[in-house]
């Protein structure tokens, strides 16, 4: 029987540490209510929560060793982040997964941790699938022979059902994706996250840190309103100890489906992603133009990279994949062998 969010099986009884019930918001320099210094540090002096934090349970999550063992067969773990919704982060995650998997020598997993807005199954063409449970754990849904997906969407009795959960329950679900899913031997695990810096990001980072998360790819668009939030995302990564693999500028230019020429729609009013990456001291992985056929491919659950290899967007995505591979210490041309379509015009 497949697990369901409406009729949870035993696997949903996720053991989580009880968070302290704070009487006031955490101050700016708070070490964290679950940290070893909670209630003891200099920043705690005078805080209304000091006594509560000092008496709260401390120590590492007991499930982290289990997660580390489960993910030990995965060579590279990549987070995909964005500061703002609507920049194409989930679309980019699906394109990244398809591009990595276009190399038949690579095995790729895509984990959808956007609990309240799971769109990955639709984009990958497996929306109607369900999860199977065996002695080895939950089996991810296989899109192709070398590309698998896990999402809460597979557990919904009806695809339009809303997920209305508070932070601890969402964190418990993410923990199950990492602890109970039988990913097997993977070359790459791509973790698509919700926008912003929320509970899900903290949960994924804390659970993956011991198992060696390689880093994060941050997605933005050229406009300053997106870059404003990306600066916060970069600051979050640095404070959380997440290595930034690089910044990707999405929707930079529009590809005409008739003539394949590229024109600017969302102009970079303050220099765009490339200038921001240079200013913030992080790698710039490349710009991906907006091609209407990307949306069409996602709606039909097909691989845009495979269906439209001559599109400037496909060529740009492949270059980003090679850049990510290089940041991971791999040979870019081994990660994705070049072909005659890959020269970006």
Curated annotation (Swiss-Prot):
Pfam families (alphabetical): ParA
Necessary cofactors: [4Fe-4S] cluster
GO MF entries: 4 iron, 4 sulfur cluster binding; ATP binding; ATP-dependent FeS chaperone activity; iron-sulfur cluster binding; metal ion binding
InterPro entries: Mrp-like_CS, Mrp/NBP35_ATP-bd, NUBP1/Nbp35, P-loop_NTPase, YlxH/NBP35
PROSITE patterns xrefs: MRP (PS01215)
Protein's UniProt keywords contain Hydrolase: no
Residues the record lists as binding [4Fe-4S] cluster 1: 30, 44, 47, 53
Ligand binding (ATP): 83-90
One biological process term in Gene Ontology: iron-sulfur cluster assembly
Keyword Iron: yes
Subcellular compartments: Cytoplasm
Keywords carried by this UniProt record: 4Fe-4S, ATP-binding, Cytoplasm, Iron, Iron-sulfur, Metal-binding, Nucleotide-binding
Cofactor: binding comment: Binds 4 [4Fe-4S] clusters per heterotetramer. Contains two stable clusters in the N-termini of nbp35 and two labile, bridging clusters between subunits of the nbp35-cfd1 heterotetramer.
Gene3D superfamilies associated with the record: P-loop containing nucleotide triphosphate hydrolases (3.40.50.300)
GO cellular component terms attached to this protein's record: cytosol
Family affiliation: Belongs to the Mrp/NBP35 ATP-binding proteins family. NUBP1/NBP35 subfamily.
Oligomer and partners: Heterotetramer of 2 nbp35 and 2 cfd1 chains.
Function comment: Component of the cytosolic iron-sulfur (Fe/S) protein assembly (CIA) machinery. Required for maturation of extramitochondrial Fe-S proteins. The nbp35-cfd1 heterotetramer forms a Fe-S scaffold complex, mediating the de novo assembly of an Fe-S cluster and its transfer to target apoproteins.
Name of the protein: Cytosolic Fe-S cluster assembly factor nbp35
Organism taxonomic ancestry: Eukaryota, Fungi, Dikarya, Ascomycota, Pezizomycotina
